[in-house]
Amino acid sequence: NVDLIKLMITGGVLDAKAKGVPGELKMKPEMVKAVCDKAHALGYNVAAHVESPEGVRVALENGVDSIEHGAKPDDEIIHLFKENNAFLCTTLSPALPYALFDRSVSNASEVEQYNGNIVFEGIKECAKAAIANNIPVVLGNDVGCPWITQYDFWRELYYFHKYVGVSNAFALYTATLNSAVMAGIGNVTGSVEAGKCADLIVTKNNPLDDLRALRNVDLVMARGRLYNNPKFKTKNIVTKELDKFCLLYTSPSPRD
């Protein structure tokens, strides 16, 4: 069954042919509007991959419900977010390796690293502006991109705290309940409440004190079924390189 429509309104880092032009517009505005109108008529929300200010503007002007990634916003873009009650899905994980890894590790070209920095900074600035303007933000990690795995989503929460400057509590809320609300299932899951699905994880240490506690999961409860001490395959090179950006930690953030 279809749950959501996703558009690729812009390109990204890997298909940009020159420095300074990541997120080139790939869909005409009238095409975006036609898809959104049809999807909404059928009861579906529309998300859009967007990595340039022009792409964000085209998406929001033509009915997109959530922006995946984002780009540095101006006042007009902030207004469009609010006018459309749109969400922002912040995804620092896919941009970080291209922006911050040594190119001998990432195998990125000089152009890809340059544009990776533009996208990484744009995602950060979009998230900060959205939070400052009470625009709802959720988290994603764009799994399937290089250096992104299925088993360590906790890193996205950590990056959100480290690079956007939110509290640990806000990062947890953004990744759970707010994300469930965006997906249209906030009445079913996303928080521990009577009447909702028993979906939660248990960790030995408290992620409110240090989000890296989420790395070691002792128990998963999914729709009431228990999975004790879950095990999964990992990629050592991925862990080694990504851990370099998760080891420098200041004092625990306030529990607000």
Predicted regions and their residues:
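His/Asp/Glu-enriched, well-ordered alpha-helical/loop segment
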Residues: 41, 45, 106-111, 120-206
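Active-site core of metal-dependent hydrolases
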Residues: 8-125, 138, 144, 165, ...
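Conserved small/polar residues in nucleotide/adenosyl-binding loops
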Residues: 249-256
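Short alpha-helical
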Residues: 53-54, 155, 209
